[in-house]
Amino acid sequence: MKEGRETEPAIQALAAVLMSQDVQDWIAANYNGVVMPMGAEELTIPEIAEPVTLKVGASPSPHAEILEYAAPILAEHNVTLEIVEFDDYVMPNTAVEDGSLDANYFQHQPYLDDFNAEQGTHIVSVVTPHYEPMGIYPGKTADLSVFSK
């Protein structure tokens, strides 16, 4: 989400639900190691008296699927989740920056840091619900030390 919105109750509710044991267990059960949960972190879901809608951009899989699972849980706390799927990695960030999305869910921290630096945007991460493992496969390089950070 855009910097400065981290403490909004609906954003905190979204973060808490994504990090809940329920969602973390669902990730583990549904992605068979292709997507790995980060581990439950019991964040408090704030009281939200008036219904609110959060518009969140996400890649179709696994991010939008995880949000679809989280949506009914959020609804129990007066938060309606509107999920907007994107098939590129630029529009979700520009939409958060211009305010047409409240948040997005699709990227890792190094990508976000580079995007902010290159585009002059002000997007921050609140939680990391999962990671997607990557493999290194043999090819022409015999020693991994040739790769820099």
What are these regions (language model features)?
Residues M1, D114-V126, T141:
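Ligand-binding "clamshell"
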Residues M1, P60-S61, D87-Y89, G99-S100, ...:
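Beta->alpha turn/N-cap motifs
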Residues G4, Q21, V126-K149:
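A conserved helix-loop-strand patch within extracytoplasmic ligand-binding domains
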Residues E6-V17, S148-K149:
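Short amphipathic alpha-helical coupling segments at ligand-binding clamshell hinges
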Residues L18-G39:
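Periplasmic-binding protein-like
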Residues A40-K55, L74-A75, D143-K149:
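Immediate post-signal peptide segment of exported/extracytoplasmic ligand-binding proteins
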Residues A49-S61, V79-E85:
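Short, well-ordered beta-strand elements
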Residues I83-T94:
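Short helix-initiation/N-cap motifs at beta->coil->alpha
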